[in-house]
Amino acid sequence: MLSRVWLIALLTLVVAAAAGGAEGGFLRRSGTELLLDGKPLRLVAVNKFDLFLRYLKGGDERKQAQEALASAAAHGFTAIRFSGVGFYPVDMKNWPRQEAWWGAFDALVADAQQAGVRLIPVVNWNTSLFPDMAQECVLDMLGAPDSRSWQYLELYARQLVARYRDNETILFWELSNELNLGADLGPMRPYGYEGLNWVDLGTSYMRLRRDNYTSDDMIGYMARLAGAIRSVDSNHLIATGNSAPRPAAQHMRRQQGEMDWTPDSLDDLAAYMRDTNADPIDLISIHFYSEHDNMRFGNTDPLSAKALAQLKEAADRVGKPLYIGETGDNYEQRPDTPFLRDVLDTATRLKIPLTLVWQWDLPGDPNDVNPTRTPAAVEMMERANAAMGGG
């Protein structure tokens, strides 16, 4: 752990090095380009899922988050994606205590602004959070505006967005995390399934039949949530937080009672992207990992990122900017990170505006990226930022 004196000194250096990193107005979209201060955005930055949760806990937990924030900024990673809400119901216990909850969020935003770091809060990371709080199922939240779970979510989203709608430290809002990966799986689990069921943390005992949902259920829900956010905040752009569509996503969407894993064509991919990123959603989010998202369109090399070209082409057909909300490598098996290298090289060549690596300074996590544990990855990210003109 860093000493408090060292932390203050580092934050001072960061402000000098990142002069106005959180200045330049709000992020804007022009066709398939993202513009910040009138210039095309080109940036490699990071995820830190637990950033706000550590601020909320206080003490040493907050100190770790502050150190991670300062360290990211010092290395030129001037945007951080994180969960802007609790993960389990137990994490929400201080939500009714407005001073404790929003005081922690205000402190995070203030520290980020001082460090020159933009923030990408995910409004609802764990899809089951609000249904578990309401003792309902996911489909209630997605499809029933009068459900308790939707009312919980809408209230929280409106509180969060209204509080920071005029703050340029917020880069943009994300609605969820990988909601698309849970869609259209009903035929595989017709009676329910186990998923993040930690009853001691406030969850339901099991996921039930009504926790399944389709892409079309998701599309309606996303439109409703994005519309609620847009009605409060006209300054910030909105993204879904989705992963790259499954290689068979459009076929799965059209399935009739059984799974259809037929690989999608480029036309299918573009149609799925169009429908799942309809207005008022501004940006097309993908998460891109080895052996999950890259094995499509003829690619058989698990360490190749060439499928990014087809994903970018599909997004261009939709007419909205595509960014990589998560990517990374197996740092224990491949310390030289060949997949991440190809992702960064390909993103640079394709002029993808934003690439966010999973995940920054999470002690004990196998995906932890930091200068001590994964120096090759950090240096590679810094070089990519220099090549893009970001950082």
Question: What does each model-found stretch correspond to?
Answer:
Residues 148, 153, 276, 334-391:
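Aromatic-rich peripheral "rim/lid" segments of glycoside hydrolase catalytic domains that contact
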Residues 127-162, 204-206:
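Active-site-adjacent "subsite" loops/lids of carbohydrate-active enzymes
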Residues 6-16:
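Bacterial N-terminal signal peptides
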Residues 44, 78-79, 171, 282, ...:
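Short acidic/polar active-site loop segments enriched in Thr and Asp
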Residues 155-158, 162, 169, 180-353, ...:
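Extracellular glycoside hydrolase catalytic/binding regions
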Residues 20-81, 92-96, 110-114, 230, ...:
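N-terminal carbohydrate-binding accessory modules
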Residues 60-133, 138, 161, 212-239, ...:
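Aromatic-lined substrate-binding rim segments of carbohydrate-active enzymes
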